[in-house]
UniProtKB/Swiss-Prot annotation:
Keyword Transport among record annotations: no
Protein's name in the database: Mediator of RNA polymerase II transcription subunit 5
Primary location recorded for the protein, binned into one broad class: nucleus
Functional description taken from the UniProt entry: Component of the Mediator complex, a coactivator involved in the regulated transcription of nearly all RNA polymerase II-dependent genes. Mediator functions as a bridge to convey information from gene-specific regulatory proteins to the basal RNA polymerase II transcription machinery. Mediator is recruited to promoters by direct interactions with regulatory proteins and serves as a scaffold for the assembly of a functional preinitiation complex with RNA polymerase II and the general transcription factors.
Organism: Phaeosphaeria nodorum (strain SN15 / ATCC MYA-4574 / FGSC 10173)
Length: 984
């Protein structure tokens, strides 16, 4: 039967409070009911959706008829209402439905609902603990060892999930953080109820299966089990954790000693891994040039410690075999470019340069007389910048000094980062050409530059000037424009390809010249895809390059086509050349003559797009142009340009394209063994240019090392790495040298296996280490891997301190490890029955990860108004979790708050009375509204639910109902109670 049409009008005239509606709906219809009427759930969901009742109404009414609720004061427990309870299945469903609503932040709708819900949930926690504990004690004293019923466990789990949803809800935090909340009843000061509740929850949920297999125990043993649940891993910061963090991205840390030690550990690890000399130089530069500056920045916060004390402690932790005394390692230095014998001396000299220690201290810490002292002059960025502006030749000298590991690199980089925008603003293109040539010839210098400033600070001004580059109205010669434009372009491409950057990384628009060149500059075009102007330009270039009867590349060819237009037709130019040579339209001598033009500095940058296009086209097996491609490869790769500047640019370009060339040549070599003799010289020719990339991608050698061992996969290899780091973290005092580690292993695992399987590998190893009594160190290692900054989808912002132009935030591409762990945490309940230890590990790991990153999330909230990510609650570990004092105070103040933003029609005293009633010792009594249990025939409100007409829920939208603040609630005990956020 449907509700009459006038029903909505009736409710509009005489609305029922939400509490009364919820009480009517949830009132038991029979004593000791054992099943749930499914209509109750449907009606509840619809009433909640229509906002006729709220979460506190539902919870208050459900609590009134819960078995957990204690009798009212003075009740002997034998009243006629004692058997009138709802089945626990109904409570479980209510908890789970409301927890989802709070997790999705659909609730609370207003401040009143939030405050009252918090009060109800808190009281329910206390009474549930009292009820379950008393049952356990009675059973224990009677000698009965009865396991908790599964349904009882489910109810506790449901309430626990609701608690998590409430305390993680951003709206709840905002409500409780109101500054004008005053004169409250202090419901959050007692820690007992929350602590005991979480202990009971952990006992029932996480340990139920394990306990069910144990033998009967006495009361003392049962108490020991309860205490064991409260044990958690201590929060420790291990040497391995910072070692992982710095391996992923060199950045500053709070603890000076650990920072220095970790930097030495990484350098030792690189030596043991036989890293290339360029990698070793980069790590040495970070230790010697960057670390002293970071120490200087944080030295003011180290009181009463001193930088000298931190340095002394750190040097006592480093591996003496990796960093021998200078006199002991002198012989090794003569034949080993990777020797680290001079590193300690250079580091201490750099610290002395920055005033962290005295010159006399260097000798004391070394234990011998140093071979040389610190530099005589400490550079200042502003002074260097003024010198470069007044005398351009100075910049060449300072760029050369970036090779010196003396501590002055930071000032030099700062001057360069401001000098480049100055040249761009003043349109000094000739100086830009010279500066670009100086930089792209020294890739090591570029590595040092990016230790102090962001790629955007160097590249964004250069990209802007490439966009704005134009011919002057009185331009006479156009070839010099190509020369200057090309040098700047090669520097930009060196950065882009060496560090695998995208236009998002440097903060330029998709329509920028460099952005379009990176996405389309390697693709040839079909005739019908080209504009008339592009076709015209292509014809002029083909004729100028290959027409033997012509005078060559005239000034008109350059004048008619700007450099930007030229580089977009380069792949098509190479395609036409290859096809014409293959078809016999062009002779090789003609092609060779044209390539000689392309080997000059003003056109040499075109080889980037041309060689990348040929490397891709050569792998296509549906054409017969391979012979022509190989002849052009030999000419371009093996023939060095004549001038020194052209040779340096040619070598830089080969470094940019070498990885693609090698892959192409080796693929052709495998396909056609007859070409092996002609291909091998080309591979040898580019061998010195290989491995110039500084990207997250692992080499084939590393990948084979991780997967080729018997029974080894990326999963087992990653577990083995976590195991080694965990064991080293706990024994680093007696085993100073770090295990082999590179964060590229995590990157390649993410790319191949995905974030879910990487998390599984970490969790599996944490379980194993926990069982081996090494769980605390392993947990720190796992947290460090998950929290480490990454190139893509970083869990934390990667800020470039002191950079004049901060790095932009690239777009997200996939879930990172932190987000995948959150997904696993959300589904941890499903693991409890099958793998309780895995569930514990996931929850503990997630809580620790969020706790470590919470300060960053809080800063982001203050700066950008984003959602606050509070540490998620581990039900077994809540006692150790720390929440800021201001939030605790807000919760203490919330019970009697006057929230003017939401409650505009109620005065504050009414809300205060309501909250006082909620916390009263006599509990919630609904009999005054005709809802006494066991008296279904009394009053209009006592009708059996089964006798209700079939409600048309679609017709309930007209039921206007106001909030009723006269709300009382029952509970056990008269002590202060509530959520203890201080000790969670």
């Amino acid at each position: 039967m449907c509700v009459p049409a006038k029903q909505g009008t009736l409710h509009a005239k005489s609305p029922l409070p939400g509490l009364k509606i919820a009480g009517l709906l949830l009132r038991p219809r029979a004593a000791n009911a054992s099943s749930v009427d499914p209509r109750v759930i449907i009606y509840l969901e619809r009433l909640l959706a229509l906002k006729k009742v709220d979460a506190s109404d539902v919870l208050s009414s459900a609590f009134q008829y819960s078995k957990d609720r204690l009798p009212k004061t003075g009740d002997d427990g034998s009243s006629k209402d004692s058997g009138w309870h709802n089945p626990p299945e109904l409570e479980e469903v209510v908890f789970h439905r409301l927890s989802k609503a709070f997790q999705a932040e659909e609730r609370p709708v207003n401040s009143t609902e939030g405050l009252r819900t918090l009060v109800v949930v808190t009281r329910w926690m206390q009474t549930m603990v009292t009820s379950h504990t008393s049952d356990t004690m009675i059973q224990a004293m009677a000698g009965i060892q009865q396991q908790p019923q599964q349904q009882s466990i489910n109810v506790r789990e449901g309430l626990g999930m609701l608690v998590v949803g409430v305390i993680e809800n951003q709206k709840m935090l905002n409500i409780l953080n109101k500054h004008h909340i005053k004169n409250c009843k202090s419901p959050g000061r007692s820690r007992k109820s929350n602590t005991t509740f979480t202990t009971n929850l952990a006992t029932g949920e996480w340990r139920s299966e394990r306990r069910s297999r144990t033998e009967t125990q006495d009361l003392k043993s049962l108490r020991s089990n309860f205490e064991a649940v409260d044990w958690i891993f201590p929060t420790i910061n291990t040497r391995a954790g910072l070692y992982i963090f710095l391996n992923s991205l060199i950045d500053s840390q709070n603890m000076a000693t650990d920072l220095i030690t970790a930097a030495f550990d990484i350098l030792a690890n690189a030596m043991y891994r036989s890293e290339p000399s360029q990698n070793m130089f980069c790590l040495k530069s970070f230790l010697i040039n960057k670390i002293p500056i970071l120490l200087l920045q944080i030295s003011s916060s180290m009181f009463p410690m001193t930088a000298e004390l931190s340095i002394t402690q750190a040097l006592s932790h480093v591996d003496p075999n990796a960093f021998p005394a200078f006199s002991q390692g002198f012989d090794d230095m003569l034949g080993n470019t990777n020797s680290l014998a001079d590193v300690r001396q250079d580091f201490l000299n750099a610290c002395a340069l920055h005033g962290l220690i005295t010159t006399a201290t260097v000798e004391r810490l070394l234990g011998e007389t140093p071979m040389q002292g610190p530099p005589g002059t400490k550079y200042d960025k502003s002074t260097l910048l003024e010198q470069c502006k007044s005398n351009f030749d100075k910049i060449s000298m300072y760029i050369d000094e970036l090779d010196n590991l003396d501590g002055n690199a930071g000032a030099i980089v700062g001057a360069i980062a401001e000098f480049i925008p100055h040249l761009c603003e003043t349109q000094m293109t000739m100086y830009l050409k010279q500066l670009s040539s100086l930089l792209f010839k020294k890739p090591q210098a570029i590595d040092v530059i990016l230790q102090f400033t962001s790629p955007a600070s160097i590249l964004r001004p250069l990209c802007q000037i490439l966009d704005d580059w134009h011919y002057d109205s009185d331009q006479g010669e156009y070839q010099p424009v190509y020369d200057e434009f090309g040098a700047v372009l090669v520097l930009v491409m060196t950065f882009m390809y060496r560090y695998d950057l995208t236009y998002h990384d440097i903060g330029i628009g998709a329509e920028s010249f460099v952005a379009r060149l990176m996405t389309k500059g390697n693709q040839s075009m079909l005739p019908d895809e080209m504009t008339d102007e592009q076709s015209k330009h292509l014809g002029h270039w083909l004729k100028g390059l290959y027409d033997a009867g012509n005078e060559g590349l005239s000034n008109d060819v350059f004048a008619s086509c700007s450099p930007r237009e030229f580089y977009f037709i380069v792949p098509t130019l190479f395609k036409q050349t290859v096809m014409a040579l293959s078809a016999g339209i062009l002779t090789f001598e003609s092609v060779k003559g044209g390539l000689e033009y392309l080997m000059e500095t003003f056109l040499l940058p075109s080889l980037i797009g041309g060689l990348i296009w040929m490397s891709s086209y050569a792998l296509i097996q549906s054409h017969s142009d391979l012979d022509a491609i190989m002849r052009i490869f030999r000419e371009v790769i093996s023939s060095a340009p004549s001038s020194g500047d052209a040779q340096a640019m040619h070598s830089t370009i080969l470094s940019i394209v070498s990885s693609r060339l090698e892959k192409c040549l080796r693929t052709i070599q495998r396909r056609d063994a007859s070409r092996a003799n002609s291909i091998e010289p080309l591979i040898q020719a580019i061998k010195g240019n290989l491995h110039s990339e500084r990207s997250m991608f692992a080499s084939m050698k590393e990948l084979e090392q991780w997967t080729n061992a018997p029974n080894s996969t990326l999963h087992t290899s990653l577990r083995h790495t976590v195991q080694q780091l965990s064991q080293w973290a706990s024994t680093s005092s007696i085993q100073p040298n770090p295990p082999s580690y590179t964060h590229r292993q995590v990157y390649v695992s993410l790319k191949i296996m995905g974030a879910s399987k990487v998390i599984k590998a970490i969790v599996d190893e944490l379980k194993a280490q926990t069982e081996a009594s090494n769980g605390a160190a392993a947990l720190d290692v796992g947290v460090s891997i998950i929290c480490a900054p990454t190139v893509d989808d970083s869990p934390v912002p990667v800020a470039w301190l002191s950079s004049p132009i901060p790095a932009s935030n690239p777009p997200r591409t996939r879930l990172n490890l932190r987000e995948m762990l959150k997904h696993e945490f959300d589904n941890a309940a499903a693991l409890v029955a099958t793998d309780p230890l895995a569930a514990e590990t996931v929850v503990r790991l997630h809580r620790r990860v969020e706790a470590q990153l919470s300060s960053i999330a809080e800063n982001a909230l203050q700066g950008h108004g984003s959602v606050l990510n509070l540490p998620n609650v581990n039900m077994g570990d809540m006692q150790s979790q720390s929440i800021p004092d201001d939030i605790t105070k807000a919760i203490d103040d919330a019970a009697a708050a006057s929230i003017a933003d939401d409650i505009t029609t109620m005065d504050n005293k009414a809300l205060q009375r309501s909250m006082d009633d909620l916390t009263g010792p006599d509990g919630l009594d609904l009999s005054s509204i005709g809802m006494g249990t066991g008296d279904a025939g009394t009053g209009d409100m006592g009708a059996e639910l089964g006798n209700l007409p079939d409600l048309d829920l679609g017709d309930m939208s007209g039921m206007g109902m106001d909030m009723d603040m006269d709300m009382a609630m029952g509970g056990g005990g008269d002590d202060d109670w509530g959520l203890d956020f201080d000790n969670m």
